[in-house]
Amino acid sequence: PSRARLDNRDAANAPPVDISVNHAVTITVQDSIELFRVAETNDGTYAPLGDISTLNRPLRIGFAPDSISGTRVSPETTAALEDVAQLCRDLGHEVIDFKVPLDGKEFTDKFLLYWAAGAAEFAQQASAYSGKPIGPDIVEPWTLGLAAMFQARQSEMEDTIAYLKAFEAVYDDWFSDMDVLLTPVTGSPAVPIGEQAPDGDFDAVMESVLNFAAFTAPMNVAGAASMSVPLSWSSGGLPIGSMFSAKRGEDGLLFELAMQLEMTRPWIARTPPVSAL
């Protein structure tokens, strides 16, 4: 959901740039809509979501299958996104190729430093709670590595925060000639359990994380409306999400599109080989 669209009782303690997301993963679009309505804020920042019906007009959708930072995207993910783009065309939407106008390496570098600051704060809290110095006895290698990254570049934090705060306006400019942006959610289908375990080799985990989580960060930083829709399936029988994003506040538009997509390609009867449903 758009930043501050849903009730956040801890808003007074929010960090300088709130990159967290307050919502849930639901089985149906209607479930997501109902939860959204219950949790909406009523402070006047946004109009109430109101009634949502299936989209009945064509949209201009930007198609951006490549990672902004140049990390690899699996062929299976790319093929799934191309199929979803064609689905959108079949529904009457105009799909245009879109090159994200962003220095992806700079953005990723700033985002990682900001993320590392959170790990450093957690490590300090763990040390204070345990009475032990920060080290492998109290935190895992992943947290230690991120904390060390922050300590080495702490002097850059002021500029990093300013850059990330300014990004919201940069993001909104992307939509001057389109309604919605279509990208992968992740760089590959779900990775094996343990590949990104925090007790693994730091460099190996970082490489896996950067390749996998290569698309969501801009939307988190911008506080944008964004959704993952499970329209595709991997060769291993796992869902592959497609991410549709819009300007902040355009949550209703995304819900309308989601309802149209769900009616056209329903997923409720499909489950992975191992499922709790």
Language-model features, listed with the residues they occupy:
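A short helix-breaking turn/cap at a secondary-structure junction
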Residues: P1-V84, Q125, R265-L277
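Short helix-loop capping/hinge segments that flank enzyme active sites or metal/cofactor-binding pockets
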Residues: L55-A64, Y114-D172, P184, S188, ...
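Short glycine-rich, flexible loops that bind phosphorylated cofactors or substrates
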Residues: G70, P189-A190
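Acyltransferase
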Residues: V73-V100, A123-P133, M157, I161-M178
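Short, surface-exposed loop/helix-turn segments at secondary-structure junctions
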Residues: V191-A213
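Short hydrophobic alpha-helices that are characteristic scaffold elements of the AMP-binding
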Residues: M219-V221
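Short, well-ordered beta-strand elements
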Residues: L238-K247, F255
